[in-house]
């Protein structure tokens, strides 16, 4: 299989799974093993193509991000208030991630821990879906500092590889009273600062693995990741109000043993 096809397949997997509550880490592990693309360079590539997925969310929610710099009258999720909410959401995982980065890389990327994270995240989703309380927060403009910080605390669960940042923040938001669609939308927007920072940090530490000859390979993965993430987020937002997350949870339980197998053997 050519390098460009490998890059395109991995970019497609990254884009389709990064913002869905299914764990992009688990899927990239399986795909990388099937394609025979593993090791330090593969890990760096997987980090780099996340930038394509991040850019897709920036494009889709450009008006919201632009509003953070140029607030509009009667829009509360804008300007300094909007920036403050995103900072509150990013703070817990940023602090914990920086403090425990080496430990996470060394001890939480084992076959058993990633597979368990997939299963625990699935059970968490099923439990949240059993709740029947009416949501208290309906739109982004109703977001409160307490809700933003609470979602940020749940986001710390995503530091456990395999748990899924989207699962942690969407389910955490719903548990704290956010409407299903709001929890998903805010999860995508809040992903940009923390993912950009984490991706940048990892790339700075591994930039020596890049060579000019790798540029077409990385560019292919980046572009495919961008396009597939754009389509996945667009479709997910259109459907999220009419569906539950139970199918995602059962799917995670099904692939957890596969992730363990491909990582262990």
From Swiss-Prot:
Belongs to the UppP family. Keywords: Antibiotic resistance, Cell inner membrane, Cell membrane, Cell shape, Cell wall biogenesis/degradation, Hydrolase, Membrane, Peptidoglycan synthesis, Transmembrane, Transmembrane helix. The gene is uppP. Its EC number is 3.6.1.27. Catalyzes the dephosphorylation of undecaprenyl diphosphate (UPP). Confers resistance to bacitracin. The chain crosses the membrane at residues 42-62, 82-102, 108-128, 143-163, 181-201, 221-241, 248-264. This is Undecaprenyl-diphosphatase. It is a multi-pass membrane protein. GO terms for biological process: cell wall organization; peptidoglycan biosynthetic process; regulation of cell shape; response to antibiotic. Bacitracin is thought to be involved in the inhibition of peptidoglycan synthesis by sequestering undecaprenyl diphosphate, thereby reducing the pool of lipid carrier available. The keyword Transmembrane helix applies. NCBIfam families: PRK00281.1-2 (NF001389), PRK00281.1-4 (NF001390), undec_PP_bacA (TIGR00753). It comes from Nitratidesulfovibrio vulgaris (strain DP4). Pfam families: BacA. GO terms for molecular function: undecaprenyl-diphosphatase activity. GO terms for cellular component: plasma membrane. It is found in: Cell inner membrane. It catalyses: di-trans,octa-cis-undecaprenyl diphosphate + H2O = di-trans,octa-cis-undecaprenyl phosphate + phosphate + H(+). InterPro entries: UppP.
